[in-house]
Amino acid sequence: MIGGCGSLFLPGTKICAVDSPKFWLAYWRSMADSYAHVTYLEQRFGNGAARLDIRAYRSARGAQREGRDTPEAQFVRESHEKRATENDHAKPLITACRTSLMFFEGNSSLEWTFVSPPAMYRSGRKTGTYETLTDYIPLRGDQNDSGILEGRLKGISTFDFAIAIADEAERRNFREQHWTAWGEISDDEPAPSPYINL
């Protein structure tokens, strides 16, 4: 089964990322600060309001970082972050992924594995390498510190995530476990769109 990163726990806790306002804030800030991630999200969202929202938020964060902040940019940042931490639009879907995991946990009547991508999952180049972790969201720095999450969320390319899933199908290292895989995505160049517009 494939879920979402929101079902992974924050380090040292039994709090799922989906239930943590500080996760949502770190998630959207990290997404907005990455040109490759913004492009990936725009490809997924299409030409709707969500596409404009992420682009405006990225621009507002850039204005603040570059010392050219305006009241309008501040409004965009504050309203986006308030919405993200109070009731992010993706929360119902991610909560549903967590619920589906709960149907498997403790169930030994069938052989299962449940993989969740790390927070910074996107199209990107194939490296063929990845690392794994069970139950917890992978972070840069001290993996046991769930204090500040901003700038610490790890990721993986869709190619490397697919390799991790295929490897698990063959090796079965994570039977009856919830796990994740992450890899190198340091380049900030958008990958060609994996989506086809009809």
Language-model segment annotations:
Residues M1-I2:
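Generic beta-sheet signal
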